[in-house]
Amino acid sequence: MLRVVLITGISGSGKSVALRLLEDAGFTCIDNLPVRFLAEFIANARDDAMERVAVAIDVRSPGELAELPDVITASRAMGTSLSVIFLDANTDTLVQRYSESRRRHPLTDRLARGGKTPSLAECIALERELMAPLRDQEHVIDTSDLTPGQLRAWIRDLIQADRPPLVLTFESFAYKRGVPSDADLMFDVRCLPNPYYDRTLRPLTGRDEPVATWLGGFDIVTQMIDDIAAFIRRWLPQYTQDTRNYLTVAIGCTGGQHRSVYVVEQLARRFSDHDPLLVRHRTQLPDDPA
């Protein structure tokens, strides 16, 4: 059976956040679909054997909003599982969000008269009036006091969507080339003993057994890895609960060849039970593909 989640509500209340969550949960998402196209879109999705679809509808087509309840009723009568989530927030919160984003309200031009620009409060008041027939359709969420993360969690619980697994990435890097911009957590291991000063180990990498044996012989190296692993294990559930999809842990040393590579490889072994798990080395190692 085709499942459709309809996201609507007051502009600035979080529809984009909700739609991105549904997209991450595997829904095919359409934003700002005019009401006149909704029935046809649902019919095509059913014919194409699509399973999960999410559609965001806002006030940009005000003349069509009154037709939406009938479209919803007809779609359900044809066997579509359709749920409606109406997002709202108090006017003060909406005004603050618009001020922070510096975006124009979609009804600004509609209310403009004689070259006079309407206030944001006037636009919001008209939008509430136009959206009133939809507010009592099904689920209403007041996002006034919700963070984006909380809103995503609420909607996930509401639609009982599976949480996408968090992709855990360990990457090594060289401080002399700069720090990676994609790192969520960063650990500096330049304080550890450096194999570079052993001429026999210098051309090797942290993935080679002689370097691994050399570094593994120092208690301070093992303790550093233990501490980093313990920190990640302690806080990984919280990062997952924060509804993020990726967590990148960067380990840096001077050249990105010995210590950071070894620590990353050891951490990857300790978290081998986490799926998906990625390992990246920013410095091209001798056995890497060109």
From Swiss-Prot:
One of its GO terms (molecular function) is ATP binding. GTP binds at residues 58-61. Keywords: ATP-binding, GTP-binding, Nucleotide-binding. ATP binds at residues 9-16. SUPFAM superfamilies: P-loop containing nucleoside triphosphate hydrolases. InterPro entries: P-loop_NTPase, RapZ-like, RapZ-like_N, RapZ_C. The keyword GTP-binding applies. It comes from the Bacteria. The keyword Nucleotide-binding applies. Coiled coil: none annotated. Belongs to the RapZ-like family. This is Nucleotide-binding protein BP0690.
